[in-house]
């Protein structure tokens, strides 16, 4: 083994051989180190404002759609809110110190729109913008590069009251907000992302009603989809106009590798292609000038009612990079009772395969397949994995340790799949783990834990999990053994 004990007090390999084989796909390189990825590969962690900051009404901040959504009805498990979350707004120095201790060189975070512009437009809240100014400075003082996401789902409530993402004016609102941030922070922030996962905030927020603003309307989904697609391009142009020429501008896409429930059955194969068009291609292809994928998903022809003259030319934008955000694969079957899409997903529990606290299948190879799929576009920019991780139940031992071997195994398998992609020549240039700390996981509340750092929400005490110490060792250059990879003779380690 490369090393026997972590600072947390437990062997890296403890009880890993008790995990299902799904954690260790045979395509994973049996050994790797940071050096295998090259000196320019970007390593980091990701968070989001609403999920971590708390201080929801502090120092002039306006209300967001999530501040409203968590109060309106029983939308969140346990009726929990993000009012405090992991208290990052007040405890950011501690968290940045932990990042520095773990050797994490890049930190992706989002800004809270209503903290900067309380009503979404108009006067800037000086204290809110000052917070992000200090955050950027203190990241740089610790040799941590800030990566800023302009919009991570927390639309100001005042804009929602004007229609939010269903109002075409949101395209200009977002662009103006992006320029406010760029003018203040652009001299120090080199990497920018316009939107976080538009498929999620349009679909879960406007079609399924699971996320803010809680709409359940096909029309609202289609309007929000077109406006978000315009906004990702216009937001990119707004940043390009306001930032130094050296700045790198990207955006992020959620994605899942899709396979048919019954391989070779034509109706399941067709259902899988329809689902892929919606879940993986809907926001990607317009950015490349390819338009919406209506051939595979005729439902998207209904977007025409929201398209105005000149929109087709406005949808593309030459991003410097795409953020790929992948957690699982999905299995698709034909569903005659699901109108328009005629498809549904077959859950991991029903299929009898290992799954996470979120109910997502443990399938690290999904990341590799999506990197290949996105790289296959003729004009695709370089790719970075800007989110990847897993939620598993954590237990703090009496000694104050968190032995999260499942998360550690999942991360090392996924990172191995990134290396597999790079060895095949794909332009994958970074990996950001989701997430740095445990946080408020949207409709699921605080139960699912994704963090490398455990949060005791009663005391806000931080405890680095074994996965966090493992990530430190990877970043320090240690050789990682993917245990128990196919053919490995490594035996189960004993506790320290």
Predicted ranges, named:
Residues 17-76, 100, 119-121, 129-400, ...:
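Active-site region of glycoside hydrolase catalytic domains
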Residues 2-4, 488:
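Serine residues within intrinsically disordered or low-complexity segments
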Residues 77-90:
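Active-site mouth loops of central-metabolism enzymes
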Residues 111-124:
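Glycine-rich, proline-tolerant flexible connector loops at the mouths of alpha/beta enzymes
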Residues 91-112:
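Catalytic domains of carbohydrate-active enzymes, especially glycoside hydrolases
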